[in-house]
Amino acid sequence: MNKEKLRALLAIPAVITVGWGFAVAGNSGRGMDWISSPFACAVLLAFCLQWVAFVPAYLGRTERYFDIVGSATYILATAMLLIRSEGLDTRSVILGLMIFIWALRLGSFLFVRIHKAGKDGRFDVIKNCFVRFLAAWTLQGLWITFTAAAAWTAIASNYKEPFGWYAAIGILIWLVGIAIEVVADRQKSQFKANPENKDKFIRVGLWSLSRHPNYFGEILLWSGVAVIAIPVLQGWQWIVLS
């Protein structure tokens, strides 16, 4: 077994362990019941959906549905939490809408992009290796959990606080973040569509100010989500902000 396969083989249980840790933290350290804990169910769903999608993806040696499955997972897990919530409040609804809007926008953008390109070069090698491809899908489950954990914890929490200044500031941060991400993605798409720019790195618009403004926008919008969630986090749940 080569080093890449060995790393992937070791990474899978490590990633699952970290995901389990997040599930425990989001449940405020009160032990673990995967059925009765909405947050734990969301984490479990995030991983299971990746593993289910991995099977046809590996059999077909395709990565075309990797991003769209990730986006759908955000939506399905968040919807499940909203449905299971014992008392929906304004904070939970807004957090849910933020995730829905972001996931639908980015998921559709990435899906169209990869179908135009025909492939995603990141997967050229690993999609032909069972262990490495499975590790990539498993890591996506953890990434979804990691980014959405603050929102999921707030939605699943029985502890509610009035919708105050934290939430207003968080919404503003989120709006700025998603605006930056949308503009950056559009500018890069327009740049790549010009044959004269083949093999060139974009340095116009927001890309003249930052090497990866789209990533900056995403970091910013998830930071806004975290700010909104902060007032209802308790005990071990603060770990989800890490």
For every predicted segment, state its role.
Residues 1-2, 25-34, 54-61:
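Short juxtamembrane and helix-loop transition motifs at transmembrane-helix boundaries
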Residues 103-151:
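Hydrophobic alpha-helical segments and helix pairs
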Residues 51-63, 108-115:
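C-terminal ends of transmembrane helices
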Residues 9-30, 46, 50, 74-106, ...:
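Hydrophobic transmembrane alpha-helices
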Residues 33-48, 63-75:
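Loop-to-helix transition at the N-terminal end of transmembrane alpha-helices
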Residues 6, 36-41, 58-66, 208-213:
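Short, amphipathic, aromatic/basic-enriched membrane-interface segments that mark the entry/exit
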